[in-house]
């Protein structure tokens, strides 16, 4: 295999919790120690958390966590999720390149690869960027997806504990119910500390919280 960096994110479709972007460098020397690494969506939460510990030990990596308050601030600035994602991907890639030179970066199919290229700094502008459909089949992208998911799960749990509650994943009816309970207990002004306010879920929560 050709040594390269994989990059992926977690929390993009979750109302509660941060947006996490991770990048991970994998070379032939790492493969033997990455057994069990595959797309994080196919793993249970405990296994993802366990694998992430091993990946961090074995591979040069970077994890960028954008908490809800910062996320909402950046989203208001960018007004576009793809620009925000490109910003996060670029930071993670640059951080890994600072630890380990590489000439190839693979990411999931990006809506606008040019936006990611534009956000990269000096080191990043020299690498080849490949966007792939179902990129999680690539070992480095799979490793990055596990790192991102593990960090998301850890921070979501910690965020809930700060407010004495459990914040569910996703954007389902269960999430709306939890959002309504949170607003009634903590007030609307604190929702931005735990949730992404541009989601349609936010409008559903506010409508029901009025009742």
Which residue stretches match the model-derived regions?
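RNase H-like, Mg2+-dependent phosphodiesterase core
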Residues: 1-211
């Amino acid at each position: 295999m050709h040594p390269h960096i994989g990059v992926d994110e977690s929390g993009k479709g979750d109302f509660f919790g941060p947006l996490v972007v991770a990048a991970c460098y994998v070379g032939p020397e790492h493969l033997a120690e990455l057994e069990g690494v595959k797309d994080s969506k196919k793993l249970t939460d405990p296994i993802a958390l366990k694998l992430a510990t091993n990946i961090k030990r074995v591979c040069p990596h970077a994890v960028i966590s954008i908490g809800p308050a910062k996320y909402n601030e950046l989203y208001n600035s960018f007004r576009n999720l793809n620009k925000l994602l490109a910003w996060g991907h670029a930071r993670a890639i640059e951080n890994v390149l600072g630890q380990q030179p590489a000439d190839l970066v693979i990411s999931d199919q990006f809506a606008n690869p040019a936006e990611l290229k534009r956000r990269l700094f000096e080191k990043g502008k020299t690498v080849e960027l490949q966007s792939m459909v179902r990129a999680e089949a690539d070992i480095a992208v799979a490793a990055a997806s596990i790192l991102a998911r593990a960090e998301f799960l850890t921070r979501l749990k910690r965020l809930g504990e700060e407010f004495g509650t459990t914040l569910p994943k996703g954007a389902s009816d269960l999430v709306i119910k939890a959002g309504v309970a949170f607003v009634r207990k903590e007030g609307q002004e604190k929702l931005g500390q735990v949730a992404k306010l541009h989601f349609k879920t936010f409008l559903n929560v506010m409508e029901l919280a009025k009742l």
